[in-house]
């Protein structure tokens, strides 16, 4: 209750690696630029091939948040979050996460039960309240979360799901 904040402490080597990955700007260029960037994609592929999931998961999740914000985000949301998502300064960046999985469906997101109900407006768009429990999160300590939830009166399966941007700290 109250102001409980969950946090994860990473080993200093994680941050040293993150600084090297982000600060040259090449890997994040894969989602910083709107057009495909073959060099960034090749570097991501090579680092994945050698087992670097510790940062590749956050890079991929953040790319998803950027894509969703560009496609559907209000100008206010884009102004608030895109600069932090697109910076190459490791200590100033915002990371993205994905909360999709629920216990009853596993990887079958069409079976999701978490609900979203409209609750006014904020930042130039509809504000939603999310009710339910997610089972797994990719990049759990991220700043911004893409979360699926079932919208009121939506159809069964994946067509009844909405995708919501949730700041970790409100």
Would you name each region that the model predicts?
Residues 63-68, 104-108, 136-139, 154-156:
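Flexible loop/turn segments at secondary-structure boundaries
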Residues 30-65:
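Extended, domain-scale alpha-helical bundle/helix-rich regions
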Residues 1-34:
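Extended, charge-enriched "interface" segments that sit outside catalytic cores
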Residues 60-76:
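N-terminal glycine-rich flavin-associated loop
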Residues 73-119, 123-126:
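Internal maturation/activation junctions in enzymes
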Residues 65, 98, 116, 130-132, ...:
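Buried hydrophobic positions in well-ordered alpha/beta secondary-structure cores of metabolic enzymes
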Residues 57-63, 92-102, 163:
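Core alpha/beta catalytic barrel or barrel-like domain that forms the active/cofactor pocket
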Residues 127-170:
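A short core secondary-structure module
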């Amino acid at each position: 209750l109250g102001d409980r904040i969950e946090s994860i402490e990473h080993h200093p080597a994680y941050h040293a690696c993150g600084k090297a990955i982000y600060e040259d700007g090449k890997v994040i260029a894969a989602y910083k630029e709107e057009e495909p960037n073959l060099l960034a994609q090749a570097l991501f592929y090579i680092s994945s091939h050698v087992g670097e999931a510790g940062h590749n998961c956050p890079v991929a999740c953040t790319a998803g948040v950027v894509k969703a914000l560009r496609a559907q985000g209000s100008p206010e949301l884009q102004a608030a979050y895109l600069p932090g998502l697109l910076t190459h300064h490791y200590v100033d960046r915002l990371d993205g996460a994905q909360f999709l999985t629920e216990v009853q469906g596993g990887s079958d997101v069409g079976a999701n039960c978490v609900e979203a109900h409209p609750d006014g407006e904020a930042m130039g768009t509809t504000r939603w309240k999310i009710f339910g429990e997610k089972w797994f999160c990719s990049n759990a300590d991220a700043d911004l979360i893409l979360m699926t939830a079932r919208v009121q009166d939506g159809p069964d399966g994946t067509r009844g799901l909405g995708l919501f941007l949730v700041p970790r700290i409100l």
